[in-house]
From Swiss-Prot:
It is a multi-pass membrane protein. Its cofactor is Zn(2+). It is an enzyme of class 3 (hydrolase). The record marks Y338 as: Transition state stabilizer. Pfam families: Peptidase_M28 (PF04389), PFF1_C (PF22250), PFF1_TM (PF22251). Residues 646-657 have a biased composition (Polar residues). Residues 599-608 have a biased composition (Acidic residues). Its EC number is 3.4.-.-. This is Vacuolar membrane protease. Gene3D superfamilies: Zn peptidases (3.40.630.10). The chain crosses the membrane at residues 12-32, 416-436, 470-490, 494-514, 533-553, 561-581, 699-719, 736-756, 764-784.
């Protein structure tokens, strides 16, 4: 039995191979997205790394909530310091503890050596490690965000371990008189985590996994034979969750200028894989390539740079404010557990620890081995006040199925794109010219003079058939797909929160079915062997135009995120080239026309012989002969051949619904001598000449267009859905995640369109059923579940002056109201919801909570919690504020009118690295302290629109407070006399249910599909006002 060709361009093979190829790509991509690579056995781990130990450390760290403003935070800090000491001692490393930090650089040492003589000797040579226990650093700054008039004073308590490198400066170089010069000669690597959590989360992945990874890095790099060439600083910073404050306090360390490179470990999800969020340059991305399971792309980096992703991490401080180069590695999913009680050890795994740890270890090893000027030397921006980290190279990087890594320069991508823009049209033009010269250019061919016999006859080639089908189908399919996006956004936009794959199934099935219906329908009505080639030509035109914009983005905007277009352009060009070269298998058009006319004449003679017994009806024979060589049907040709058409136009249209086949398809096929014709029959009434085209080249085109491009883009598509699908409850746009799916659906299925008209009806009809089912589900299903919980935000405010106690639940009003309806306390109250001033999609819904007063200081009355005094100086230029509060580290000062300078007793001058002083002044100051009992003495400087100097923010220039204008002078004097200062102190420790009963009521009674997170720094704020006259 003869087996059929499995690669022929027929419905069966096309349906099979297109489905198999797409599934073979998409299923592994989904698997990579949804799973974490298993950790290796203990025997295969790098020396010094112990995952069992790391897991136990994580369980200890996440036993309780441990925000900066909690006593548990101190316990976690002590544990990490003790574990660091234990590791150093276990590995036999001499180390000292440096109690410096802040300014001035005064230090004392506590040596781990048993004898003072040994300690003295160790100070003269490179020590194994130094532990910096910083309880001195403080920073005064203004918030760098626009339209945010806020000042901050922060007292840090970071600690960090400096592992001395074999090529580092000798001795305790940071104590030398010329510390800056010595530091800048180094090439240290900073690896950072933060050990505080939010007040509503246990901080397993944000950022406990990172901190236990640092402990394992400490163990590895202090093991025998693993001392790095360049020193490594392992920073455990505090108070990241409340404004990246620990990283800013590190700016006063003498090691800042020493660390040229950075590996920041973070968590913006709660488990899964740790993704390379962003990097500064190509060299850093190449260092990451040593990771055994790389995961990420340049798209995320570009999204951060353009403000599409607004999540802030310590990375921005180290890179933007200090000038270091490096990477930001972070967990990114699932977002619904981020900053909630589900960010715990139960919802992560040892595999997740290994994924982050292995990436950090490989990257740190690579950076610590660098001895050239790759990360050292003058900066490209010429700034001398930042770390002299060399000249970075803009790059492009992405992973392949989470197992391999590609990284190359952005200039290389631009050169690639530019080469495609210039060379591909030229190559196609040359090939087309040769085809025209050889009379084998069948595209756009209309009629050819056969020049056979006594009369002049022309043969139609149907070279325009199928030309406009693809753009028409693309426009309609795109419109319907984008329309479905807006439909979902209108009816049930948050369905992507829990059912992202359902949204993908709906979009993909809709675009596929509509494209097939239109393209297959057009081919059925008017078959054309050129449809695949025309579709590829249109794809080439589209990708060429898009590549123009991509080249501008790459060259002018330094955007590497468009790299997938270079792949698509290259592959489409190759596929078009194959379609052109296919025509060399065809005879010259003139030869085919002559052959066709010759066969027609033979057919007529044979027919006359066969019909000679009919009484010599020559007129009928003559009429049939004329019909056989007639021109191809026109747009006025009737539906049935025996009906008359109207008009005289001879031009055909793409979707004309009749087609008169050339003579060889009818008469020639019955001629006994037409053996050649019988060897190359056309498919389904396509053009007669098309039977000579190769039937297997489509499969090569499929393999060119689909696997590589869909792999690159499909990975980005899944990451986009996972990272953005759950941001709607955070106040982000509800439309953007859905629109991303819609646009990526179109881009993913574009490579299929040249072949889709050959797909049998079974696949699209199945997808039609999928579309109907998923559409109904997506429009009607409740978007949240116990595994994908609706996130809302809690805050309680007690106003001592008004005697009020109000709880605010912030979130999407449609879902916040049912949460409030499930609580006992607000029952019967009229709930009013106001628009959030910062996030327009969210609402602040409030209810009276007087029955649930907080107990934040072991039974102390609320009115006794805050000690607050304020008075104006004799000259009226300043206001002196004395503020203290029980059992908290955080208080705010709000002023009724702007101030133009402030200082805190014992604090440093304002640091210009973190923002300039706003010309309009400040009306809020945040005050943070490292201990629990020392109060704040703050001086507020009054005045006009005068910007304090960068060197001393506490000096403000006096301006006239009273205008000479009699109509306004009295009001201004009254405003000055009634200067009001409001103290707001915050409490965040909810490890005991009795501390903030209103919060625990919410946790106890909220629906299973909802989960609570913090709204601001404190879960409870208590306020008190003073009028200063």
């Amino acid at each position: 039995m003869k087996l059929s060709n499995p690669f022929v361009f027929r419905p069966g093979p096309v349906s099979f191979w297109t489905t198999i190829v797409y599934l073979a790509i998409i299923i592994p991509l989904i698997y990579v997205q949804e799973t974490v690579p298993p950790a290796p056995p203990e025997k295969d781990l790098p020396q010094g790394v112990n995952l069992t130990e790391a897991w136990l450390d994580l369980e200890v760290i996440t036993r309780s909530y441990h925000p900066f403003n909690s006593h548990s935070n101190d316990i976690v800090r002590q544990y990490l310091v003790r574990r660091s000491r234990d590791i150093l001692e276990r590995n036999g490393i001499d180390y000292t503890t440096d109690l410096t930090g802040g300014v001035p650089w005064e230090s004392r040492y506590l040596s781990s050596a048993e004898h003072p003589a040994q300690a003295a000797e160790a100070s003269a040579r490179p020590r194994g490690a130094t532990l910096f226990d910083d309880r001195i650093s403080n920073v005064t700054m203004t918030n760098p965000q626009p339209n945010d008039t806020m000042g901050r004073y922060f007292e840090g308590n970071n600690f960090y371990v400096y592992i001395h490198g074999s090529e580092d400066p000798e001795g305790d170089w940071w104590t030398s008189d010329n510390v800056q010069r010595v530091a800048r000669n180094g090439a240290g690597v900073l690896v950072n985590c933060h050990f505080d959590s939010v007040s509503t989360g246990y901080g397993a992945t944000d950022d406990g996994v990172a901190c236990v990874s640092l402990l394992q890095l400490l163990s590895h790099f202090t093991s025998k034979g693993h001392q790095p060439k360049n020193g490594i600083v392992l920073l455990f910073n505090n108070a990241e969750e409340d404004g990246l404050l620990g990283a800013k306090a590190f700016g006063y360390s003498p090691l800042v200028q020493f660390c040229n490179t950075l590996v920041n470990l973070e968590g913006a999800g709660a488990g899964g894989r740790a993704m390379l969020f962003r990097t500064t340059d190509l060299e850093a991305a190449e260092a990451y390539s040593k990771s055994p399971h790389p995961f990420g792309s340049v798209v995320a980096s570009n999204a951060f740079e353009r403000g599409v992703i607004k999540s802030g991490t310590d990375y921005s401080v180290f890179v933007d404010n200090y000038g270091q180069r490096g990477l930001d590695i972070a967990f990114y999913s699932p977002r619904s557990r981020y900053h909630t009680e589900e960010d715990d050890a139960r919802h992560t795994s040892v595999d997740s620890i290994w994924h982050m740890l292995s990436a950090a270890l490989a990257t740190t090893e690579s950076l610590a081995r660098t001895t050239s000027t790759k990360f050292n030397g003058p900066r490209s921006d010429g700034r001398k006040d930042l770390v002299q980290s060399g000249r970075p190279t803009a790059g492009v990087w992405f992973d392949w199925y989470g197992s391999s890594w590609s990284a190359f320069s952005l200039r290389g991508l631009f050169a690639w794109t530019l080469t495609l823009l210039i060379t591909t049209p030229i190559v196609l033009f040359v090939v087309t010219y040769v085809l025209v010269r050889d009379d084998k250019w069948y595209f756009f061919a209309t009629r050819v003079d056969s020049s056979v016999g006594d009369g002049e006859e022309t043969v139609s080639f149907g070279g325009w058939k199928g030309f406009v089908r693809f753009p028409f189908a693309l426009v309609v399919a795109t419109a319907l797909t984008i329309g479905s996006v807006f439909l979902l956004a209108k009816v049930n936009p948050l369905i992507i929160y829990s059912s992202g794959y359902s949204v993908w199934a709906m979009m993909l099935s809709l675009f596929y079915f509509v494209s097939w219906l239109l393209l297959r329908g057009a081919h059925f009505v008017r078959p054309s062997a050129l449809q695949r080639g025309f579709t590829l030509i249109w794809l080439f035109i589209i990708t060429w135009v898009l590549s123009v914009f991509a080249a501008v983005a790459e060259d002018r905007m330094n955007m590497g995120a468009v790299y997938s277009l270079a792949f698509l352009h290259t592959l489409v060009f190759a596929a078009v080239l194959i379609s052109l070269l296919e025509q060399y298998a065809l005879p010259a058009k003139q030869d085919f026309a002559r052959q066709l006319s010759g066969e027609n004449e033979e057919g007529e003679e044979q027919e006359q012989e066969n019909l000679s017994g009919d009484g010599g009806n020559e007129q009928n024979h003559e009429d049939r002969g004329e019909a056989d060589i007639a021109a191809a049907p026109t747009e006025t040709t009737p539906l049935r051949a025996d009906e008359e058409g109207q008009g005289s136009s001879e031009q055909t249209t793409t979707f004309a619904n009749t087609y008169r086949r050339p003579v060889p398809e009818t008469r020639g096929a019955t001629h006994s001598g037409n053996n050649r014709k019988r060897s190359f029959p056309p498919y389904e009434n396509e053009q007669a000449w098309s039977g000579r085209l190769p039937t297997w080249t489509w499969f090569i085109q499929l393999l060119l267009l689909v696997p590589l491009y869909v792999t690159v883009l499909g990975n980005l598509a899944l990451v986009q859905t996972t990272s953005m699908g759950m941001t709607g409850t955070d106040g982000s746009s509800l439309l953007v995640p859905l629109m991303g799916v819609g646009i990526l659906t179109i881009l993913l299925l574009l490579p299929l369109t040249p072949f889709i008209h050959r797909v049998s009806h079974h696949v699209p009809l199945f997808l039609l059923l999928v579309f109907i089912g998923t559409l109904i589900y997506n429009l009607t299903a409740f978007p949240f579940s116990a595994n994908n919980r609706f996130k809302f935000y809690f805050k309680q405010v007690v106003d001592l002056d008004k005697g009020s106690n109000v709880v605010t639940l912030n979130g999407l009003e449609k879902f916040v109201r049912p949460v409030i309806g499930s609580l006992p306390t607000p029952a019967g109250q009229r709930i009013h919801c106001d628009e959030d001033p910062f996030l327009s999609n969210l609402r602040n819904c409030q209810y009276d909570a007087s029955l649930l007063p907080p107990d934040v200081a072991n039974g102390e009355k609320l009115e006794n919690l805050i000690s607050f005094e304020a008075s104006k100086s004799k000259n009226g230029k300043t206001v002196l504020v004395s503020l203290d509060a029980l059992n908290t580290r955080v208080c705010f000062l709000d002023t009724s009118s702007p101030i133009f300078g402030f200082s805190v007793d014992g604090g440093a001058k304002r640091d210009d690295r973190f923002g300039s002083f706003p010309p309009e002044g400040l009306q809020q100051i945040q005050l943070w302290r490292r201990d629990w009992e020392k109060g704040w003495n703050v001086t507020l400087y009054l005045g006009g629109n005068v910007l304090p100097t960068n060197q001393d923010s506490v000096e403000a220039t006096e301006v006239d407070e009273v205008d000479d204008d009699p109509s306004g002078g009295e009001l201004k004097r009254r405003a000055v006399r009634e200067f009001v200062v409001t103290a707001r102190c915050a409490w965040s420790d909810v490890n005991s249910a009795n501390t903030i009963p209103a919060f625990h009521e919410v946790k106890q009674f909220m629906p299973r599909w909802a989960i609570v997170a913090k709204k601001s720094v404190g879960l409870v704020e208590i306020t008190k006002k003073i009028k200063v006259t």
